[in-house]
Amino acid sequence: MKVLVVVALLVTLISYSSSEGIDDPEADELLSLMANEQTRKECIPKHHECTSNKHGCCRGNFFKYKCQCTTVVTQDGEQTERCFCGTPPHHKAAELVVGFGKKIFG
C-alpha cells in the first residue's frame, strides 16, 4: 500500500513538473501585476462620486476607502442620494495613532 501511494505521488509530481504552467513563472507574475494595475485604474479615488458603484473605492494608505452616502434635498423638494469615497472616522483615528507612533518611534 505504501509503495502504491509513493508511486502515485511520483507520477503526479512528474506530470505536474512537465506541465506548461511551471515552465514560465515570470509570465504568470507579469499577468498578475497587469491585473493589479488594471484594478487600480478602475477604482474610484478619494472624494469622487461612488453612487453607482458603492464597492469600487480605491485603497488608502492603510485602509480601503468606504463609500459614504448622504441624502440631498433639491429646491423642488426631491430627495436624492449622493455618495463619495472617503475615510470613515474610526479609520482616520487609527491612521492618526499609527502616524503619531511612527513619529515617536522612528
Curated annotation (Swiss-Prot):
Highest rank taxon of the organism: Eukaryota
Major localisation: secreted
Protein name: U1-lycotoxin-Ls1b
Organism: Lycosa singoriensis (Wolf spider)
Cystine bridges: 43-58, 50-67, 57-85, 69-83
Similarity-based family: Belongs to the neurotoxin 19 (CSTX) family. 04 (U1-Lctx) subfamily.
Keywords assigned: Disulfide bond, Knottin, Secreted, Signal, Toxin
Domain notes: The presence of a 'disulfide through disulfide knot' structurally defines this protein as a knottin.
Position of the signal peptide: 1-19
Subcellular location: Secreted
Any one GO CC term of the record: extracellular region
InterPro entries according to UniProt: Spider_toxin_CSTX_knottin, Spider_toxin_CSTX_Knottin_CS
GO molecular function terms noted in the UniProt entry: toxin activity
Tissue expression from the record: Expressed by the venom gland.
UniProt propeptide residues: 20-40
